[in-house]
């Protein structure tokens, strides 16, 4: 045993699993926004929330060549998690989505950002795949 975590896919990462679950409910809630916001705020919420998982997956795939590439994509995912906090604040302040739900999701994205930062600073090198 090498001491490395048993992670063979981006889907094995806890941060990916969490970042995948949150947008499912958020997507449904965004569909309830006004028609005028469907092409603006709602669309941005759907894209930014899903880009977190996309960046984790893309970075994980590129880590075979470079841990620096993986880390770069983790930074982009973290940026999207921070961006989501802004969009959710707008939804709350404009009374588009229940304030308690928005605060819950903002907490989730804060936690996801912390997890991504932790992976960036300590775990990205440990996950580097060398056995293929």
Specify the residue positions occupied by each region the protein language model found.
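Amphipathic alpha-helical assembly/interaction segments
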Residues: 1-132
């Amino acid at each position: 045993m090498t001491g490395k975590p048993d992670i063979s896919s981006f889907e094995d990462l806890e941060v990916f699993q969490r970042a995948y679950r949150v947008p499912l409910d958020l997507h449904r809630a965004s569909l309830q926004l006004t028609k005028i916001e469907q092409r603006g705020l709602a669309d941005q919420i759907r894209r930014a929330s899903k880009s977190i998982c996309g960046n984790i997956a893309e970075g994980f795939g590129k880590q075979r060549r470079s841990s620096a590439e993986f880390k770069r994509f983790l930074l982009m995912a973290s940026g999207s998690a921070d961006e989501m906090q802004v969009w959710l604040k707008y939804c709350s302040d404009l009374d588009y989505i229940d304030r308690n739900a928005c605060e819950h999701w903002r907490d989730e994205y804060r936690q996801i950002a912390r997890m991504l930062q932790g992976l960036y600073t300590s775990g990205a090198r440990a996950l580097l795949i060398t056995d293929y």
